[in-house]
From Swiss-Prot:
Quaternary organization: May form homodimers. May interact with DAZAP2, FAM168A, PRDX6, RBM6, TMTC1 and YPEL2. Interacts with CDC27.
Protein name: Myelin-associated neurite-outgrowth inhibitor
Modified residues (Phosphoserine): S6
Protein task: Inhibitor of neuronal axonal outgrowth. Acts as a negative regulator of CDC42 and STAT3 and a positive regulator of STMN2. Positive regulator of CDC27.
Length: 195
């Protein structure tokens, strides 16, 4: 029988019917009876945590605790002044953390959408949109792309360049080639490793 549901009273040792040896310090009986339940969490009167509410006491907290002056009671349900709350503007977001012009200034609701498994989903744990820098156009080269005529497209210039008469080939320029060491056994026999 399960000793937890045994009808035995508190303090009665277990009926060790199978002769199981318990290690030293193992409780051989039920624990002492638990203390009686008390509805009051603090025994006796506690001056720090007073129970109840004194009628007529203003419920507001003083805005300047050092002066001790309590603001007068107001029937308004809002205990705070109106100036405490920021006013929502009709203009776009202008935050000191979102630099205008340098980065995008969309507020962070979710990460930019990504196409995953052919389904556009939104990653909720992405970085704020203000962190992503604005894309810069690729730099344009100073010269004209090889094989093209300035001011034209590839479709316009390809046929003309391919069918145009080739000029007379230029004679090869004289190039001086340095003299290399003759092949053979090197002057060294062993190079120590570098590690």
């Amino acid at each position: 029988m399960n000793p937890v549901y045994s009808p035995g009273s508190s303090g009665v040792p277990y009926a060790n019917a199978k002769g199981i040896g318990y290690p030293a310090g193992f409780p051989m009986g039920y624990a002492a009876a638990a203390p009686a339940y008390s509805p009051n969490m603090y025994p006796g009167a506690n001056p720090t945590f007073q129970a109840g509410y004194t009628s007529g006491t203003p419920y507001k907290v003083s805005c300047s605790p050092t002066s001790g002056a309590v603001p007068p009671y107001s029937s308004s349900p809002n205990p705070y002044q109106t100036a405490v709350y920021p006013v929502r503007s009709a203009y776009p977001q202008q935050s000191p953390y979102a630099q205008q012009g340098t980065y995008y200034t969309q507020p962070l609701y979710a990460a930019p959408p990504h196409v995953i498994h052919h389904t556009t989903v939104v990653q909720p744990n992405g970085m704020p949109a203000t962190v992503y820098p604005a894309p810069l156009p690729p730099p344009r080269g100073n010269g004209v792309t090889m094989g093209m005529v300035a001011g034209t497209t590839m479709a316009m210039s390809a046929g003309t360049l391919l069918t145009a008469h080739s000029p007379t080939p230029v004679a090869p320029h004289p190039v001086t080639v340095p003299t290399y060491r003759a092949p053979g056994t090197p002057t060294y026999s062993y190079v120590p490793p570098q590690w």
